[in-house]
Amino acid sequence: MKKKLLDAIINKKKENVSFAIITNLENGEGCIFEKDKPLDKNFNKFEKKINSYFDKKKNGIIDETNIFVETYILPIKVFIVGAVHIAQYLVSFAKTLNFEITIIDPRGYFASKKRFPNINIINKWPKEAFEEIKPDKDSALIALTHDPKIDDPALQYAINNNFFYIGALGSKKTHENRCARLKKSGFSDVQIKKIFGPIGIKLGGKTAPEIALSIISQLVSEVYKQK
């Protein structure tokens, strides 16, 4: 690997962005690929295939070429608002899927290291919490508290910052009331419809782990709808 490419890789890792390393195995030439950015002209004719590998998080040699694609994809960021019982099962599923998890809950007796070991916990109100962290387009919000004082500011932030997945726990009636509050706060019907409520796919389950499974299944489905 040439020094110029190695330096570029180091810089991209410092920037904390998703990218791919493209290498011509025949001559050793290479470049960095980033989604929606111009590709080195030497690899232009492979751009469609490179995009496909990147979207599928796939490493390997493009068929019938000497072009090797190695992807470095940042994990999906999952912000769980409300350290309730369901959240413990959600965290377990999300960790298995290598998601980057943050629990947000101002109630320290719920959001504790004892209940959520080895998980990033922010014991602040959502508005304050999101000032500390850096969500991006690969961020998901799961609101679980049933408390408008906690859930609503988080939902508003997620809508305004284009989270790819936004879900909120509660009955149909609870969600109707939630939508009415958001509309009163100035959000459009189109924006409000971004929220999955009631959250989760219809598995028919009633227990905390079953509800958590329905939520994480819906989230994974939305991950791949982005592709």
What are these language model-derived features?
Residues 1-117, 174, 180-183, 218-227:
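Segments forming oxygen-rich coordination pockets for charged ligands
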Residues 93, 153-157:
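A short acidic, amphipathic alpha-helical/loop segment
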Residues 100, 120, 191-194:
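Conserved beta-strand segments of alpha/beta enzyme cores
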Residues 140, 145, 156-181:
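ADP-ribose/adenylate-binding Rossmann-like module
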Residues 169-227:
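Adenosine-phosphate binding glycine-rich loop
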Residues 127-137:
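Short amphipathic alpha-helix with an adjacent loop that forms part of the alpha/beta core around
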Residues 148-152:
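Beta-loop-alpha module in the N-terminal Rossmann-like domain of NAD(P)-dependent dehydrogenases
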Residues 119-125:
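Conserved SAM-binding strand-loop segment of SAM-dependent methyltransferases
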